[in-house]
Amino acid sequence: MSKRVLILTGDAVEALEVFYPYYRCLEEDIQCTIASPVKKKLQTVVHDFLPEMETFTEKTGYKIDSHASVDEVDPADYDGLIIPGGRAPEYIRMNTKVQEIAAHFLKENKPLGVICHGQLVLTTVRKYLQDREVTAYPACRPEVEAAGAVFVEQTLHVDRNLVTGQAWPDLPKFMKEFFNVLKKAEKVNS
């Protein structure tokens, strides 16, 4: 049976952090569903790092369809979850169904990949984040630590079922580790 991965996001998602995982999943013959608070064509954004800037820049990116609203999603139907960054996590984390989906993957120890600002979603399900080691975009560190997680100063970190990355330049290693965790989970559940 084919594996199924859910990507949980919304408008202002970092373009690379949604497109790269989506197409990598398809390349691996994994069914991949993009879900957002409202099923629609999502507007992505492009973040870049310029030497003269103290923070990243943001420009309008491509659009991508979400396949389902979060209200249509049963997390039990999915083998893995990816939460991309960008600004989408700032507002989708307030959606109770988004919180339920994130909690399901942490509680059930199912493969979960979270990159950049995506960790902001996890801060809403603190009881499952306690003492978990994560990395994130460095500006998210105070919120991640306030939620009880241990911030690790690495560009990529794996804590059991949880794969975390700092930013889009880490996507190749991030997806490699996410697929490793997905394969291990498949062996355990076989």
Each language-model region and where it sits:
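Short, basic/aromatic beta-hairpin or loop at an interaction surface
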Residues: 136
